[in-house]
Amino acid sequence: MFAYIRGRLDYKNNDFLIVESNGVGYRIFTSLSTIADIGEVGGEVKVYTYLYVREDNISLYGFVNQEELNVFELLISVSGVGPKAAISVLSAISPSRFSLAVITDDIKTLTKAQGIGKKIAQRIILELKDKINKEQLTSNIGIEADIGTSGGDDSKVSEAISALMVLGYTPAEANKAVSAVYTEDMDIETIIKNALKGLARP
């Protein structure tokens, strides 16, 4: 119903925002990361929104960027994951880290979110792994990797390097770690996992 709402930020706390637009105040539930990034009360803001409608509940959820909204929509598509759990995930980890956790079966990262136990984390990975493709991961990271335009091997290497960079490693560290473990028969998940093991060694 609403793609986004642009207006004046009237109020914010750890759970929701109130944005006034054309004389109407919208209560928008959101993540801690959006609360931190949205700006000061009184300023103009743009919030990407999702209207959640159930028989006993109509609520508006929103985020400061499209990437958070995309992950929110993916999460609530998972059986047993509602909006509150999705908000909890987005409050704990960034969209790029979420995407990386899913494609690398990183249950530990997902369970950092309050209310997300091991079983739910496993279900998230199972149901979303095929939906989070290489292009989406690289887009979330914000690094150009020429996925889909380069050869298959170059694509896997570029994507693995990009994934390590989002975890805080420098381009040089990421490139060295990937080069040390890469073989042609590896898929992207195996490359990343093996590279991380190498980086973890003293």
Spans of features found by a protein language model:
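Structure-specific DNA junction-binding interface
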Residues: 1-73, 77, 190-198, 202
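Signal for well-folded cores of large energy- and translation-related assemblies
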Residues: 10, 50, 76, 91-94, ...
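Amphipathic, charged-and-aliphatic alpha-helical interface segments
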Residues: 51, 58-59, 83-102, 123-128
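Amphipathic alpha-helical segments within well-ordered protein domains
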Residues: 72-76, 87, 107-111, 161-165, ...
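Small-residue helix-packing motif on alpha-helices
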Residues: 86, 98, 121, 174-177, ...
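Glycine- and Gly-Pro-enriched alpha-helical subdomains that act as flexible
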Residues: 111-114, 124
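Strongly charged, low-complexity linkers/loops
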Residues: 129-179
